[in-house]
Amino acid sequence: MAERMTFPMYAIHRQQTQALWQAVQSLLDERGVMVAGDPPAADPGDLLAHWRQPTLLLSQTCGYPLVTQLPEVQTVGCFHYAAPGCEGRRYRSLLVVREADSHRMLGDFFGRRAVCNAEHSQSGYNVLRKMVAPLSREGRFFSAVMFSGSHRQSLRELQQENADIAAIDCVTYALLQRHQPQALAGQ
């Protein structure tokens, strides 16, 4: 039975995502593993539901939900990206602010607004929580924390001045720099 395969985490440049899908499909085919259909044309939406689909053979996931919410999922490998901030399988999050605030230190954002992609994101939420914890007062640091649904949307919220700071993973940032630099304008 042929099963599905998707790479939703960094699907910023459709042609590159399709090329990755086709290369992996070819490798699997050589080993007798059939993958159904063509590369998905759309974002799968709810990623946690997507990762739990019984017909899903191979996908990408953020490490935090992998270890906290997906016990039925098996790790088969880890991509090594060439983006600045990546070293082998390790990567970093970047704290991104508007250009007008680029001279500020993290402590200067006390009482300001943060935007995070999702509560189940290591790179967009938990890393920021860990960084501000020693700076918090009575368990609080930001005046508000909103969830945008994606790193790209978090950047839009910064551009629209709905938030003041966001943590963005370095792979997303590098791909946006290369393929959609307007998404980083003003930051």
Which positions does each model-derived feature cover?
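Bilobed "Venus flytrap"/periplasmic-binding protein-like clamshell domains
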Residues: 7-23, 88-148, 154
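Alpha-to-beta junction loops
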Residues: 51-58, 112-114, 159-168
